[in-house]
Amino acid sequence: MKSLPDFIKICEVGPRDGLQNEKVFLTIEQKLELIETAAEAGIKVIEIGSFVNPKAVPQMADTDQIAARLHRKAGVEYRGLIFNLQGLKRAEAAGISKAKITVSASRSHCLRNMNKTPEEAVKSFAELAEYAEQKKIVLSGAISTSFGCSIDGIVPLEQVVNIIFQLRKLGIQEISLSDTTGMANPLQVYEYGVHIKKLFPDIEWVLHFHNTRGMGLANVLAGLMAGITNYDACFAGLGGCPFAPGAN
């Protein structure tokens, strides 16, 4: 077996990915307790929520208040998910210094999630990158359905690589490949990991797996064998996508 990395970095995405699909709404106080407990447990990167339209994702309607009231622990990176310039400005107003923009490699999923094609979504990110640079906000990127889509089926790696090129042109240095619908398998993860690291050695890579088919941990191991050391995780294994059938 190929030697594994000595160190990995975990981002807790529970406050966002874990809660966005839940029918039971937590109070602001309960969400703050979850975030602050994760920080006390030693998690160094926490995604506190998404700055998106509350009508589309009601569970995230209080993200601005969460950010404003959060007791921030030194040495912990608190980030938020955004889709557009309005979301970025909300994140800025809430004191968030790192925001993640996301686009789906699947056309159908991107239309459901953002009401845009992947090409339109990436094009719209140019003004976000310009604004973020002016305001000294760090942008990271995430590519949903990188390993397949429950709507479109197979998502060619070429589509993913094309989006990576576009994000890199915007100056983004950290990119996550997300298995939004849990369709990835270990061989695919390893091959993708080796390929993208060779193509883009200057990018900080993150992997985000769902456990829809019980392959989550096996895919993490495959990612580690490919040399990728950054992973998203979610407390209690919660999580899913409101716009992707069967994602969990």
What name fits each language-model region?
Residues T180-N248:
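Catalytic alpha/beta core domains of metabolic enzymes, predominantly
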Residues A56-G80, E119-G141, N162, L187-L207:
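Alpha-helix-loop-beta-strand connector modules within alpha/beta enzyme cores
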Residues K9-D17, I46-I48, E77-L81, A99-I101, ...:
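Hydrophobic faces of well-ordered beta-strands that scaffold small-molecule active sites
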Residues S50-N53, K73-E133, I137, G148-V155:
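Active-site beta->alpha loop and helix N-cap motifs at the rims of alpha/beta catalytic domains
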Residues C11-Q30, V76-L85, R112-P118, T145-Q159, ...:
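Active-site mouth loops of central-metabolism enzymes
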Residues M1-K23, K100-N113, Q134-I151, I196-D202:
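N-terminal small/glycine-rich loop or linker at the start of catalytic domains
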Residues I28-V76, I82-R90, G95:
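Glycine-rich, positively charged N-terminal anion/phosphate-binding segment
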Residues K44-R69, V103-K116, T145-I151, S176-P186, ...:
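Glycine-rich, proline-tolerant flexible connector loops at the mouths of alpha/beta enzymes
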